[in-house]
Amino acid sequence: MIVIRNWQRISYLSFCRFSTRSLSIQQFQKTPLLLVVRQQGSARLKMTSSPPEIVPQQPLDALLLNKTDTEQEIFLTKYPNYDGRDILIAILDTGVDPSLPGMQVTTTGERKMFDVIDCSGAGDVDTSITRTVKDGVIEGISGRKLAIPEKWKCPTGQYHVGLKPIFELYTKGVKSRVISERKEDVVGPSHNIAASEALKQLTEHEKVVGGTSEKTSDKWAREDFACKVDFLKSMASVADVGPVADVVTWHDGEMWRVCIDTSFRGRLGLGNVLGTFRETGDYAYLTNKDSVVYTVRVSPDGNLTEIVVPSGAHGSHVAGIAAANYPDNPQKNGLAPGAKILSLNIGDHRLGAMETGQAMTRAFNMCAELNVDIINMSFGEGTHLPDVGRVIEEARRLINRRGVIYVCSAGNQGPALSTVGAPGGTTTGVIGIGAYLTSESADTLYGVYKPVESSIYPWSSRGPCQDGKLGVSLVAPAAAFAGVPQYCRQSMQMMNGTSMSSPNAAGNVACMLSGLKQNNLKWTPYTVRMALENTAYMLPHIESFSQGQGMIKIATAYEKLSEILVNKVFPPRLTHFEINVSNHCKKSKGVYVREPNWNGPQEFTIGVEPIFQNHLSDNNLPAISFEKQIILQSTAPWVSHPQTMFVVAQERTMVVTVDASKAPKGANYTEIVGIDTADPSLGPIFRIPVTVINPEKVAVDQYTSRLVGKSGVTERRFVEVPSWATSAKITLRSTNKDEMDRFTLHTVYIEDDKCSRNTETQKIQGPIGNEWSKSITVQGGKTLEACVVRAWSRGKNPVDVDMTIDFFGVKKPTSISLIHGATNTPIRFQAAPTKSIDVSPSISLKSLVVSLKPQSAKVEPLGPRDMFLTSGLQINRLLLTYQLKVQKPSEVQLQLAGLTPYLYESPVDCVLFQIFGANKSFVGASSSYPDRWTQKLEKGDYTIQAQIRYPDDQVLQGMKELPLLVHVKLGNKISVDLAASASDATLGKECKFAGKALLPNQEMTVYAMNIADDKLPKTIVPTSGSFLAGTFSALKDSDLSDVDKSEVIYFLSEYSTRPTKGLSMVTTKKDTNQNQEMTDAIRDLEVSWVQKLTDEKAAKEFFEACLQKYPDHLPLLQNRVKQLMQAKLVDQTPENVQKIIELCGQILQITKPNETLQFSSVKQEHDDDLLTVDKWLALTGGSEDQRKDVVKLISQFEERKKSIILALQALSSLEQDIEVRKSKFDVPASLRFGGITPLIFGGKQGEVINKKSEGYEALKSKSEQIDATVSEELKKLDSNWTGNQFYVKLLVWLSADDTKTALISAKHAAALGQFGRCAKLLNKAGDELKSSATDSQAVDTSLAEVCESLEWNHLATHFKNSALIKNRTSYRLF
């Protein structure tokens, strides 16, 4: 039984939408319905045996994708074979999943997917290292032994190996889901069991031993149990780094093959062997759990393997709209089911699937190489500079030289005007598609039951482009259900946007081209576009800015285009008519009069030039013979122009006058169209767009207007902003709105060469309340557009909305510069002439900007995929490397001034950053629009690489000194104190300006004070050129002050070293002797070189020579001990360890540990030298005459203490190496054989081995020799030595978990089999090493082995993967 309340209208289709299961029509008709009929406030029940008989007019599948409004159904009914066959569509998007049902075959049975390519580089794997098989295995980059199946063929015997973290191939959503499922299904249960067992062991020990004991072993055991509990608790929230796969690439004699070790254990026979997709069509899934499909490509030399995965669901959905083919259910087909698809992924995984210049230009090159017919690109961004930039240059070359039809989304930034994006709405030759809402789809696609009128979606971007082009070319249906990648875990998904209208249009065009190709008719982008625009249906009551030339009508367009091509109306190499508009110094592509100061007659010089494709031919006859007699027409009385034009193959100019004062208020659009007198039925052969915005004036400081809120209909108001205004508050009031009504408020004003996203404000108002307000920034003298649109789904009954715009103004500097150290800096501001304002001036600094110089810069040519076919250009790159030291966890953004604000309009191909940790671990990426890419950096050292791509290597050479600006978000904003006068500011007298007001036109000056040094940020040490950035606001109103701001730059000098106490502190007077200072400097230089020499023989000889001159100099002895202790076990010798122990003994003899320990108890952290001298004299019973000697002695104690600790570190480390090697417990091999010992002394890690490693037995034998020597020498040093004495002595000076002691303590714990304590200490040491430039792989490997010993296998796996991810053999490729 089904209960339905408020029965008004129900159909089989809408019923199925609400039902939890799918019903056939017959089942639906037989289902009893319980209707609840509302009558006079009460409900009465009525049982019905069956619903009214409703027969759906079409199956539900037919409503998933609109093919009716564009005439596609009519077209294919008439021409069933013109379904896209023989046409190749390139989908420049997030990649297409080749496993989808609709992507398998065309209507002719051919493979649907021509190729699948990742142009971004995010899936690249360096496979330049080769291995040969030995005993049936090769060693992977991971260190795993990879078993080569016997059935693999490799005539060369060379296997290329690489490494890829699997999470780098996941989208953010997939990664989040996989982590959650792994935690719930695998990691979580295992971890909970381990934590429970650890707590049980601790509780049991507490019961048995109690709180006191005389045995040290009980102390260590208790600590071990407690450490297990603490360690497991800390690991419960650790980030899942995911598995790491070895990649093996080889040539089987016919083609390159690739196997990704998805067993993660070296069992390659369990993995999938794939050939390159273009040749084989092979694809596989990374794992069954994630369902992420991948394909592969390999460079000609095998040194680069591309793992191609979708970076989002968007691309598959778009491809499904354009050309999906379902042989068993044709109603689900895309628009061109017979077409083939070329998947070109331009959405970079590293950037959340945002496009990059690198990806787009590579994609254009592939389109040229593979002879693509149509591009669909459902991507785009706002642009500061329309129709320019390296990406745009390559796009236009592809259109003009290769004849590719380029269809692109216009953007989703509406409803305000001039919001079209690049490239769809701003690029000459690109067909920009707007978004059409069909009333028939509202029920099925959106679940909207109220009547809906077909219209343009409110969010669809509108023209005109800022350079005067109309922006939107055509519109097409913009919502559909289509297939999405299997990792989405659903077969289809509903999406809307111009991203969906563009492939709808592209699919329609593919059908048209399919017919032309089968009839051997040669088209050009120009003829295709002209036929589409001249036959499109202009939707009634919808402005041209929204719909361009109207709805695509493909059947009509095909007939028109066929006629043009058959009659050869245009030369085949005519690419387009170039329109150039000049007005004084401004160049544009159309006439766009918007600002109030243009309100009068304006003259424009307009050039019209036919452009021919001449780059591939010496035949100039088509251009020479080209002649057209043109009639010029327009319908607007405010435009005056010549009536005729004779066009030949050169630019022809004319003068056009536009009188904005004669145009109606609001937005006005017309076109000067060129009609061929020889054949007027063709329609316009070129169009000159003319837009005039005639704004309304404001009465004093307020504008009001009543809007009619029809669902989905945009109400626009254009207002001349008063010259003094800097901000405004817009208020909307509705008295008769529906309780669920929502309104979108969108405001825009235009600045020259600035994208509308920088000057727009958009907010959805409602549904709560009936009055809303929004404060915005405005610019005096500009035209402000304020448009309001009611949600399109609210039905046909309009509501009234009153809009009020109140203007406010405060005249102030647009930018304020302050200098650290300046005691007062005046800042002047003035109230508007029309009203008083309440003021509360303030300066808030929000970020530190640090300027970094490049440490290295290299210009080099890129590989084969960056040799561009259409332009013939070899793309080069400049690789800049910067070093960044972060002292506290920070959030940073990266900027190259003058380059990163741009993408499509960028003068270079691409700017891409990658951030790496100390050991080449990948941390994050950034590119254009730095404010979108915030990286969270922990304390440590980082390497930042910036890649700039450009064809001309000399241009890149000139950029080799570019500074990198690192924007560091301040944890707490810094407020700059303001004073009422210069003298108050200098004297530090801050003024609170609460309750202050300015009369109209009144001026006020405040004085910015200096920031105290202790308030400056310490996250990153500023360099020369660094500054603090923030804003200044004068207004008291919080909403207005948030938008009415001036930029503030506070320039810093480099930090000076500050004393720990006040400047008035009295310190001990030190004797100076210039000759002694010189002698000491020479000695220190020599001593520093002892540790720098890498040749052991030279180092030994130099040390002995220095020792003769400075026999008791502690830094000399320390440096030699460090140098010898940094040696790996494989390089260590009995003679060297003997020397280490000898030197440590010498150090302990010189330093007198007991005396030094006494001093440590006397010297407190904040004591000054004078007080310490008094304490020492009192403790030792010394006299005042000994003061000078004590002062000298005290100055030596810190160096003595440092030397003692180093000596005990070395002795205890050698001592514990013996203990772990003779331990009866299963101590990890990396601990047992000195893998971490060199790390203690600042060296590189030792061997990371296990019992199966080659050389294990030889290393074991050598360790026995070393241990024998160490044991003998330690007994000589301390006759009472039995095994742990030096470690216990070290604990006198440092705690067991001190960073200098942690690794030694870990060895001590491992020797006792106390792996809980060992794990906690290793984890702490690993965190410390990770933040420095020290390789921590040995520590992570040891941690993994310790966890295996404890049977914490989930953590063992984590640390193995972590070791590989944190310690890369090379930087991630760009």
Swiss-Prot record:
Top EC group: hydrolase
An MF annotation (GO) of this entry: tripeptidyl-peptidase activity
A GO CC annotation given for this chain: cytosol
Domain Peptidase S8, residue spans: 62-558
Catalytic residues identified in the record: 93, 314, 499
GO biological process, any: positive regulation of lipid storage
EC number(s) stated in the UniProt entry for this protein: 3.4.14.10
Phenotype of null mutants: RNAi-mediated knockdown causes reduced fat storage but does not affect feeding behavior.
PANTHER family according to UniProt: PEPTIDASE S8, TRIPEPTIDYL-PEPTIDASE 2
Family membership: Belongs to the peptidase S8 family.
Name of the protein described by the UniProt record: Tripeptidyl-peptidase 2
Organism expressing this protein natively: Caenorhabditis elegans
Gene name linked to the record: tpp-2
